[in-house]
Curated annotation (Swiss-Prot):
Its EC number is 2.1.1.-. S-adenosyl-L-methionine binds at T144, G165, D187, N229. This is Ribosomal protein L11 methyltransferase. Methylates ribosomal protein L11. It comes from the Bacteria. GO terms for molecular function: protein-lysine N-methyltransferase activity. Keywords: Cytoplasm, Methyltransferase, S-adenosyl-L-methionine, Transferase. It comes from Pseudomonas fluorescens (strain SBW25). Its main location: cytoplasm.
Amino acid sequence: MPWLQVRLAISPEQAETYEDAFLEVGAVSVTFMDAEDQPIFEPELNTTPLWSHTHLLALFEDGTDAAAVLAHMELLTGGPLPEHHSEVIEDQDWERSWMDNFQPMRFGQRLWIVPSWHAAPEPDAVNLLLDPGLAFGTGTHPTTALCLEWLDGQDLTDSHVLDFGCGSGILAIAALLLGAKEAVGTDIDVQALEASRDNAGRNNIPEGKFPLYLPEQLPQVQADVLVANILAGPLVSLAPQLSSLVKPGGRLALSGILAEQGEDVAAAYAKDFELDPIANRDGWVRISGRRR
């Protein structure tokens, strides 16, 4: 079934006004997207993270009169609309399109991330089967890739690993497949824990080797290896707690950090860790080191 799509170029300050107006005139969905391929920076507390130049996309059922929608929008918002464009688009199998675009990826020397519906390119390699849905990590983001490559380069034999902010479980499961004895996962999102559990089962990881906790339930572990791919703000504020969870001589890898935030995050861990040079990819960085 075809749809009418209306696109507006807006600022973050206009987002709520135009979203409400589009829903008022009958839009079946309203979506915000980046107009300039910018990353979303960490927002202030209690604010909605949006790009400085944002496109708002409103979708209407087939047969909707675009001119009438735009005229009604001007009445509701009290003036001329920002730069806009309307077109009729054909329906697609969005899930199938996404699946077709998610292909096997290699990280380091040994590790492959392979969609569960795809044959492994190297059956004898370390193949992590992943079916994350659309919400959690797949390995395509530079921060996840930096962490996976770091794990691939470590000797994880019989180690105890903590994945803080585990999401899909991709880092913890990779560590287990690379030789870790146990990986503990924690996340504030119950759905993330469920995704981790599902992906562990898909990779034949026994439940006892990958216990999962909400942060307030996390026991006081002493990890050989801690990975945390979250955001710079939490990494800085949680530095004392995360440092205490790594045993002396243990290793740490942190990401989810923009390049300009790297020095501040590194400074929060420099007292307790002998830090490696910061690794940078596409404007994102990884900080790693060994516990003093």
